Amino acid sequence: MGAVMGTFSSLQTKQRRPSKDIAWWYYQYQRDKIEDELEMTMVCHRPEGLEQLEAQTNFTKRELQVLYRGFKNECPSGVVNEDTFKQIYAQFFPHGDASTYAHYLFNAFDTTQTGSVKFEDFVTALSILLRGTVHEKLRWTFNLYDINKDGYINKEEMMDIVKAIYDMMGKYTYPVLKEDTPRQHVDVFFQKMDKNKDGIVTLDEFLESCQEDDNIMRSLQLFQNVM
């Protein structure tokens, strides 16, 4: 399921990219695992409003059936809590510490802040990460970086996310990172985004900065085709 939109352009890694690539892996894995079965049987238990989810997301009804069966296989209760989410996520980054980034990512999936992610939450985010427009992906990324959900990103929030990404990558980075590398990257990007120099980045500033600066867009990896 999962740095959403990657890490900065100077960071190269032997690991897979976080949010979008893991989301893509999950979708492919579950589709391959279940598709043959779906050819012969109907999904007997569906969340309410499957047709509504089809209208609200960029998935077909068949794709939603595949995703739902896979979600139920991984989470029989129909919801996933943060501890389980962290355990699943950590499997993709065995050489680093993914717990902090998984915490932030879980909060971005848990849009209602209930402490659990339902299938509806999961598939809505997955739709954005895999098939959303650039604008939708940027808004989702802004929400990830807005840790305290006050509608703004301050430098420390950005630093917390970036540091969590580097921690998650662990030793599998090239070139080897210096301890102050995350801070240097945050300083550069925050200066570009905070256009009125008031110490915070608004959604409008974030959207404008990302769309007018090719370096920022590349660093967020919004143009990577995953479908």
From Swiss-Prot:
Expression sites by tissue: Isoform 1 and isoform 2 are expressed in brain and kidney. Isoform 1 is also expressed in liver, pancreas, skeletal muscle, small intestine and testis. Isoform 2 is also expressed in lung, pancreas, leukocytes, prostate and thymus.
CDD domains according to UniProt: EFh (cd00051)
Keyword NAD (UniProt): no
Cellular location(s): Cell membrane; Cytoplasm; Cell projection, Dendrite
GO CC term, one of those recorded: dendrite
UniProt: Ca(2+) 1 binding residues: D146, N148, D150, Y152, E157
Ranges of residues in domain EF-hand: 38-94, 97-132, 133-168, 181-216
Record keywords: Calcium, Cell membrane, Cell projection, Cytoplasm, Ion channel, Ion transport, Membrane, Metal-binding, Potassium, Potassium channel, Potassium transport, Repeat, Transport, Voltage-gated channel
Record membrane topology: Peripheral membrane protein
Quaternary structure annotation from Swiss-Prot or TrEMBL: Component of heteromultimeric potassium channels. Identified in potassium channel complexes containing KCND1, KCND2, KCND3, KCNIP1, KCNIP2, KCNIP3, KCNIP4, DPP6 and DPP10. Part of a heterooctamer composed of the tetrameric channel and four KCNIP1 chains. Probably part of a complex consisting of KCNIP1, KCNIP2 isoform 3 and KCND2. Self-associates to form homodimers and homotetramers. Interacts with KCNIP2 isoform 3 in a calcium-dependent manner. Interacts with Naja atra venom CTX3.
Protein name per Swiss-Prot or TrEMBL: A-type potassium channel modulatory protein KCNIP1
Organism: Homo sapiens (Human)
